[in-house]
């Protein structure tokens, strides 16, 4: 039986409790988002989804093993509402999708001990569910439960275009890592759209969702520019070739909705799949399962691969856990009755 062996942690006694200025005293329970920076620092987005006020916060940890302990963060800030999604903009900027309907840009300042607001734009009419930065680094895309997708100029701090191409709530947008004008979107209208902002009619429908289940998550293949994957509400993960809009591979990975898909930085990348069944699955290029963890006790919401250790995958969830998984890089033996990590 293969056990998870998390990276060694620094004993609490060896660390100094030092809550930075302006950081909230307490982190909300539901962890929604996690992103490693290129130097191995970890960014977290948290939300409180119960009670009279839906609050949120951002947290920056130079030592990821200390997360989610507030006293050992390097910077933190309270947000007006819950954090639905976030992503890095370079090494300093933080783009946030807010439950308030705002798209927010924050920035690390003061030797990375402060997170300061650069702009906050209320241009969506409902929760902003998803954000992504185009590969140019100067423009971003937001998707909302108001059915709209907006293109943003980050330097000018303004929206450039607004599209109502979907007939349902937008669940995910994903920028192509290969082409700076191309991204994907999916929605509760069951459709997946391929976008190219250079075109007069920028959206084209991908006829790849034959199952009829609602697509919930998208991710581009990091090396093959025409390939992407999507997850659906039924727990299946499918691989699509945009050249012919066909689904070339599909697997029933989870028993409930897929919440996030994240490719690894390996030369032959693994795919991390997260779900509301509280599990993490890691798949190889043929969609064979190489790793499974059920360590979370609530919905698993996000995952991020370490840029410094390619076998290290960090997940967060609504159980307030930040779990560091060591994914085997060598082939696993044939699965037996005890092969699932609990």
UniProtKB/Swiss-Prot annotation:
Top-rank lineage group of the source organism: Eukaryota
Gene Ontology CC: Cul4B-RING E3 ubiquitin ligase complex; cytoplasm; cytosol; Golgi apparatus; methylosome; nucleoplasm; nucleus
GO terms assigned for molecular function: methyl-CpG binding; transcription coactivator activity; ubiquitin-like ligase-substrate adaptor activity
Each WD repeat, start to end: 22-75, 78-116, 123-162, 165-205, 209-250, 253-293, 295-330
GO biological process, one term: negative regulation of epithelial cell proliferation involved in prostate gland development
UniProt main location, coarse: nucleus
Stored Pfam families: WD40
Keywords: Cytoplasm, Nucleus, Phosphoprotein, Repeat, Ubl conjugation pathway, WD repeat
Subunit organization: Component of the methylosome complex composed of PRMT5, WDR77 and CLNS1A. Found in a complex composed of PRMT5, WDR77 and RIOK1. RIOK1 and CLNS1A bound directly to PRMT5 at the same binding site, in a mutually exclusive manner, which allows the recruitment of distinct methylation substrates, such as nucleolin/NCL and Sm proteins, respectively. Found in a complex wit the component of the methylosome, PRMT5, CLNS1A, WDR77, PRMT1 and ERH. Directly interacts with PRMT5, as well as with several Sm proteins, including SNRPB and SNRPD2 and, more weakly, SNRPD3 and SNRPE.
Role this protein plays: Non-catalytic component of the methylosome complex, composed of PRMT5, WDR77 and CLNS1A, which modifies specific arginines to dimethylarginines in several spliceosomal Sm proteins and histones. This modification targets Sm proteins to the survival of motor neurons (SMN) complex for assembly into small nuclear ribonucleoprotein core particles. Might play a role in transcription regulation.
PANTHER family: METHYLOSOME PROTEIN 50, METHYLOSOME PROTEIN WDR77
Protein name as annotated: Methylosome protein WDR77
